[in-house]
Curated annotation (Swiss-Prot):
Lineage: Eukaryota, Metazoa, Chordata, Craniata, Vertebrata
Protein name: Putative gastrointestinal growth factor xP4
Organism of this sequence: Xenopus laevis
Keywords attached to this entry: Disulfide bond, Glycoprotein, Growth factor, Repeat, Secreted, Signal
Function, in words: May act as a growth factor.
Record-linked SUPFAM superfamilies: Trefoil
InterPro entries reported for this sequence: P_trefoil_chordata (IPR017994), P_trefoil_CS (IPR017957), P_trefoil_dom (IPR000519), P_trefoil_dom_sf (IPR044913)
Signal peptide: 1-17
Glycosylation sites: 104
GO biological process: maintenance of gastrointestinal epithelium
Tissue note: Stomach mucosa.
Disulfide bonds: 27-53, 37-52, 47-64, 75-102, 86-101, 96-113, 125-152, 136-151, 146-163, 175-201, 185-200, 195-212
Gene Ontology CC entries for this record: extracellular space
Protein modification: Glycosylated.
Annotated gene: p4
Span of domain P-type: 25-68, 73-117, 123-167, 173-216
Length: 224
C-alpha cells in the first residue's frame, strides 16, 4: 500500500489545485470493469432500488452494475505539499467534510481541504474462470436471488455453476489521474455536479484534457 500512496502523492503534485473528488463515487466503475447487477431492459429506478448503479451513456457496456463498497478514507497528512485541492478559499471543516474530503489547517501555505484516497472493496465476477466457479446458490436459483445474496450469475457456460462466488478485491481509488491517462466519464460541457452524479472525478485545470473522468485504481489486493 505504501508504494501506491507514494504514487498518488507524486501524481497529485503534477495535477494542480482544481481536481475535485465527489462525496460518493462508488458508481464510478469503468465500463469494461462493470459486473452485471440486473436483467436486460431493467429501468434506472429498478436498478437503483436493487442497490446497484445505472449508467447508459456507453451503449456497449453494462448499464446496471455492481457498485464499489467503501471501507475507509485515507487522508495521509504526511505530505502537505502534495495535497490536491477539494474545496474553495475559506471553506470550513464542516463543509469540507460534507464534500467527503479531508481537512487539516495546522500547516500554513498548503491546501487545507484536500482529496482523500478511498479504500474500497469490489466484487469482480468477470475475473472468475468458469471452471473455477464456487457454487453460491441452490439449484434453480433465479438471477435476482443470486445477486441479492452477493453472488454472481452467468448462464452462458454449461456444466458449471451459474450462481457463483465473486472474486473480492480491495482497492485504492483516487482522482489524482494524469491528464493523458484519463478515461472520459462525461460529455461536452458537462458540469461538475453532473459529473459527480455519475460517480466520476472532475478537474478543469487543464483546458485541453478530459475534465470529467473515471477514478483511478491502485494497489489491488485479492482478499477472497
Amino acid at each position: 500500500m505504501a508504494n501506491s500512496v507514494f504514487w498518488a502523492i507524486a501524481v497529485a503534485l503534477v495535477l494542480g489545485a482544481e481536481a475535485y473528488m465527489p462525496l460518493d463515487y462508488r458508481c464510478g466503475v469503468k465500463p469494461k470493469s462493470r459486473d452485471n447487477c440486473g436483467p436486460p431492459g431493467i429501468s434506472p429506478d429498478e436498478c437503483v432500488k436493487k442497490g446497484c448503479c445505472f449508467d447508459d451513456s456507453d451503449p456497449d457496456s453494462i448499464w446496471c452494475y455492481t457498485p464499489w463498497k467503501f471501507e475507509d478514507t485515507i487522508c495521509n497528512p504526511a505530505e502537505p505539499k502534495a495535497r490536491v485541492n477539494c474545496g474553495y478559499p475559506g471553506i470550513t471543516s464542516q463543509d469540507c467534510d460534507k464534500k467527503g474530503c479531508c481537512f487539516n489547517d495546522t500547516i500554513p501555505n498548503v491546501v487545507w481541504c484536500y482529496q482523500p484516497i478511498i479504500e474500497a472493496v469490489e466484487r469482480d465476477c468477470s475475473a472468475v474462470e468458469p471452471k473455477k466457479r464456487v457454487n453460491c446458490g441452490p439449484p434453480g436459483v433465479s438471477p435476482d436471488e443470486c445477486i441479492k445474496n452477493g453472488c454472481c450469475f452467468n448462464s452462458d457456460v454449461g456444466g458449471v455453476p451459474w450462481c457463483f462466488k465473486p472474486e473480492i478485491k480491495k482497492e485504492l481509488l483516487q482522482c489524482a489521474v494524469l491528464p493523458k491517462a484519463r478515461i472520459n466519464c462525461g460529455y461536452p460541457d458537462i458540469t461538475m455536479d453532473q459529473c459527480y452524479k455519475k460517480g466520476c472525478c472532475y478537474d478543469s485545470s487543464e483546458s485541453d484534457s478530459i475534465w470529467c473522468f473515471y477514478p483511478d485504481i491502485e494497489d489491488v489486493t485479492i482478499i477472497e
